[in-house]
Amino acid sequence: DGSAMTLSVEPERNDAGVYCIGAWIRDSMAGIGTVTYYDPETRTFGALGHGITDGDTAALMPFGSGAILASTVKAVKKGGTGSAGELRGDFDLSGDVGTLYANTSCGIFGTVTADCPLTCGECVPAAEPKAGPAVIRANVAGDAVEEYTVEILKVLPGAADGREMVLSVTDPALIAATGGIVQGMSGSPILQDGKLVGAVTHVLLSDATKGYGISIGTMLEAGEKT
């Protein structure tokens, strides 16, 4: 829960006669994800649509501080049956473009710097998702954001862990490029009838063309509580 703890450990002597303790410590982590929305008035953003969790325990990771950097997608490991694909890229280490202040089960939230290259070319109203055709905006090559068609198969309001929509990728170009939904696409905005309705969050391991999404209402509510 982020609180300090004091523990007593009894060391064990190894074969060389040296006393040792076993310690499992994780002090940082990094990865590629997608910004879902940005408010130019407050310079705040929401991303991922789910929390950053420990890869070994699946627990939501507390953090003291976090930073965001620009990245470029260099390669894609395609998703397949039983195996999640991923976007692979390089970070721009010339400087941070923002800071994180919250890691929640509904996404990560932060602010961008004054000189951040992130721009708001259009303001899109928010709306509730409904079953039917939709599009997602994703960056799966270089730094270009493209629009791809998907189908919202089912809406599950209030479902836990960012699984409020069941999605099916229908765009042949995206399926050819990535196999469907891959790691790194989390946070990709879902638009329906020109309105922002949510973000991509998870992929089905049994079928990479299908996955889940969180509603934008749930994500915005989580951001307001941080």
Q: What annotation goes with each model-predicted range?
A:
Residues 1-226:
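C-terminal recognition in membrane/secretory proteostasis and scaffolding
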